[in-house]
């Protein structure tokens, strides 16, 4: 395609930086990486890898395995079970390890599509789930290598956002300020 200023890419919750600048598509809502499909049935990254999706996975796993360390840590939580994942991982809980592996694999598979299209230098994991920290980063980085084509090996560096779950509001404030609002 020639003679256009923007080009639509099938990348749908996050953001892209291209040439050191925030990428803006033809319409607001570009780079919705969380809406990348994981299968033909329409399952998107957000449905399997967001904080609320991990909360659901944890509730289901704890109902099946009530003696796990993860179950013990979430027994009295009304919501936000994903916050218990990091401490349960630190205890070596196999239920927590299994959930992390599933989430990291799904996230890496979805991000492999972004990698094949954009070939970024780095993928930054932010939001509440990034509070799991290094175990999440390492698991996604390892899983991503299975899905990235050989020409892009070893694939992009995977990093954790310094802002954690504050990335979205801070980014929104930055964009509002940049727009002069």
Residue ranges and their predicted role:
Residues 3, 13-15, 104, 108:
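Glycine-centered small-residue hotspots that permit tight backbone geometry or close packing
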Residues 1-9:
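Short, small-residue-biased leader/transition segments that mark boundaries at the very start
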Residues 8-52:
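Glycine-rich phosphate-binding loop of actin/hexokinase-like ATP-binding domains
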Residues 22, 40-181:
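ATP-binding/phosphotransfer module of carbohydrate and carboxylate kinases, centering on a glycine-rich
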Residues 2-3, 31, 118:
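Structured loop/turn residues at beta-strand edges in well-structured enzyme cores
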């Amino acid at each position: 395609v020639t003679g256009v200023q923007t080009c639509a890419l099938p990348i749908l919750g996050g953001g892209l930086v291209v040439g050191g600048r925030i990428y803006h598509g033809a319409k607001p809502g570009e780079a919705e990486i969380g809406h990348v499909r994981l299968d033909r049935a329409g399952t998107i990254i957000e449905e399997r890898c967001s904080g609320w999706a991990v909360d659901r996975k944890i509730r289901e796993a704890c109902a099946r395995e009530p003696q796990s360390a993860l179950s013990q840590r979430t027994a009295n939580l009304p919501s936000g079970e994903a916050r218990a994942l990091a401490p349960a991982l630190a205890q070596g809980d196999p239920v927590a390890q299994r959930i992390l592996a599933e989430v990291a694999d799904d996230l890496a598979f979805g991000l492999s599509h972004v990698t094949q299209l954009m070939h970024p230098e780095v993928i930054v994991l932010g939001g509440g789930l990034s509070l799991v920290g290094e175990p999440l980063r390492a698991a996604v980085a390892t899983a991503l290598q299975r899905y990235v084509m050989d020409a892009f090996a070893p694939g992009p560096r995977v990093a954790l956002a310094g802002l954690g779950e504050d990335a979205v509001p801070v980014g929104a404030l930055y964009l509002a300020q940049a727009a002069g609002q």
